[in-house]
């Protein structure tokens, strides 16, 4: 894959981008210019098509990181007297709970072990206990540990019970199938610097037309008002406030490459090959994956840390980095673990090279693989 000579980012975003995507940022754009506005329009149309939302959903782009768009979606879709159920099995679910608190939206936490997925049965039980719940906010791929939550069954449940569904698809959009026709949702949030393989700086919300139209006045914020952003764009073709022009241009190039590759099925298959090569190679070195294969998303893999006393993550991270690979620093699980991403402009050959580099570092540090640490550090 052509990407230049930068280090390989083994993270769930930002991630390694292609050379063409990098080169797309070498041109300057006027944010009011018709050519730039046409790029924005084409992006929105293509993003809606990826989830088969033509006619039912619209795309509202938003400046900033993906979290900006998650907050915007909750603030707009959930009325001020609404109540949000948050199935919580990782760090990004916890972030949604914090957003609800800051927004003044009532929320209910549904605790789930970090190595297990949310299920429709658990969510239905929580809603039966508290019928005042109006919405469910579900992280699709919880990259704290790498769990893939079953979106289709959760979407069907919310539809059956008449509850709104907000999906954080930050780390799944473009890699894992999402079909608005069979997985009904009120709003779905993703961002440029993830599985489409753009660079960070813009999020977007795919929202049902009628839900967006009913959201006028819900937002706590001027800058994060999805309704106002959409209405202004429809009237003027422009963004309300200065957009990240270079990010948008790079995303257009990244999306073109995504479509040329074959779209979600082919992109997802490449990431699955990456994941399989990583897990198999790490197992040969003696590492054990934190999650069972049945719930492991092909986005990022969490591994138990070696039990050897000579293991120190900072040293391990630095020495792997010296070999051209940047791991995801730190852990988000209760147990001592580290994470390796499978996404970006990389393939399974690169993943095997990563495993080789990790093996070299283990030998260099004198680490002998034993049973994983059983307790939190």
Curated annotation (Swiss-Prot):
Q: Name one Pfam family in it.
A: Aminotran_5
Q: Which GO terms describe its molecular function?
A: 2-aminoethylphosphonate-pyruvate transaminase activity
Question: Which EC number(s) does the record attach to this protein?
Answer: 2.6.1.37
Which reaction(s) does its UniProt entry say it catalyses? (2-aminoethyl)phosphonate + pyruvate = phosphonoacetaldehyde + L-alanine
List N6-(pyridoxal phosphate)lysine occurrences by residue: 194
SUPFAM superfamilies named among the record's database cross-references: PLP-dependent transferases (SSF53383)
Q: What class of enzyme is it?
A: transferase
Q: An example of a Gene Ontology BP annotation on this entry?
A: organic phosphonate catabolic process
Record keywords: Oxidoreductase included? no
Question: Which Gene3D superfamilies does the annotation name?
Answer: Aspartate Aminotransferase, domain 1, Type I PLP-dependent aspartate aminotransferase-like (Major domain)
InterPro entries, A to Z: Aminotrans_V_dom (IPR000192), NH2EtPonate_pyrv_transaminase (IPR012703), PyrdxlP-dep_Trfase (IPR015424), PyrdxlP-dep_Trfase_major (IPR015421), PyrdxlP-dep_Trfase_small (IPR015422), SP_NH2Trfase/AEP_transaminase (IPR024169)
Instruction: Please report any disulfide bonds recorded for this protein chain, giving both cysteine positions.
Output: none
What UniProt keywords are attached to this protein's entry?
Aminotransferase, Pyridoxal phosphate, Pyruvate, Transferase
Q: Does the keyword Transferase apply?
A: yes
Source species, domain of life: Bacteria
Q: Which cofactor does it need?
A: pyridoxal 5'-phosphate
- Give the record's family classification: Belongs to the class-V pyridoxal-phosphate-dependent aminotransferase family. PhnW subfamily.
Subunit note:
Homodimer.
Under PANTHER family, the record lists: 2-AMINOETHYLPHOSPHONATE--PYRUVATE TRANSAMINASE
Described by its record, this protein's role is as follows: Involved in phosphonate degradation.
What is the name listed in the Swiss-Prot or TrEMBL entry for this protein? 2-aminoethylphosphonate--pyruvate transaminase
The coding gene here is phnW
């Amino acid at each position: 894959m052509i990407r230049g000579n930068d280090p390989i980012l083994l993270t769930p975003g930002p991630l390694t981008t292609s050379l063409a995507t990098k080169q797309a940022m070498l041109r300057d754009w006027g944010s009011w210019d018709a050519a730039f506005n046409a790029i924005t329009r084409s992006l929105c149309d293509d993003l809606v098509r990826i989830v088969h939302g033509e006619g039912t959903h619209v795309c509202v782009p938003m400046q900033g990181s993906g979290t900006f768009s998650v907050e915007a979606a909750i603030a707009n879709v959930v009325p001020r007297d609404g109540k949000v159920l948050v199935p919580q099995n990782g760090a990004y679910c916890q972030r949604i709970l914090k957003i609800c608190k800051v927004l003044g939206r009532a929320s209910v936490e549904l605790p789930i072990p970090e190595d297990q997925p949310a299920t429709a049965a658990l969510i239905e039980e929580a809603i039966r206990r508290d019928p005042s719940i109006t919405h469910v906010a579900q992280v699709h791929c919880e990259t704290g540990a790498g769990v893939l939550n079953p979106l289709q069954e959760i979407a069907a449940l919310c539809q059956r019970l008449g509850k709104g569904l907000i999906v954080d698809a930050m780390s799944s959009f473009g890699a894992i199938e999402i079909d608005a026709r069979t997985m009904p949702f009120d709003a779905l949030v993703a961002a440029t610097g993830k599985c489409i393989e753009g660079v960070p700086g813009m999020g977007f919300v795919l929202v049902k037309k009628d839900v967006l139209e009913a959201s006028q006045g819900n937002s706590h914020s001027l800058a994060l008002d999805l309704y106002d952003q959409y209405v202004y764009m429809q009237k003027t073709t422009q963004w309300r406030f200065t957009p990240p022009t270079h990010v948008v241009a790079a995303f257009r190039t990244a999306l073109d490459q995504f479509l040329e590759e074959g779209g979600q099925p082919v992109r997802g298959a490449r990431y699955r090959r990456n994941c399989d090569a990583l897990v198999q190679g790490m197992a040969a070195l003696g590492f054990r994956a934190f999650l069972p294969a049945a719930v492991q998303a092909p986005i990022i893999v969490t591994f138990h840390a070696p039990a050897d006393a000579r293991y120190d993550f900072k040293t391990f991270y630095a020495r792997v980095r010296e070999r051209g690979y940047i791991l995801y620093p730190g852990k988000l699980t209760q147990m001592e673990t580290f994470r390796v991403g499978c996404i970006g402009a990389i393939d399974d050959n690169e993943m095997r090279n990563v495993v080789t580099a990790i093996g070299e570092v283990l030998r260099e540090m004198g680490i002998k693989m034993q049973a994983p640490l059983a307790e939190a550090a």
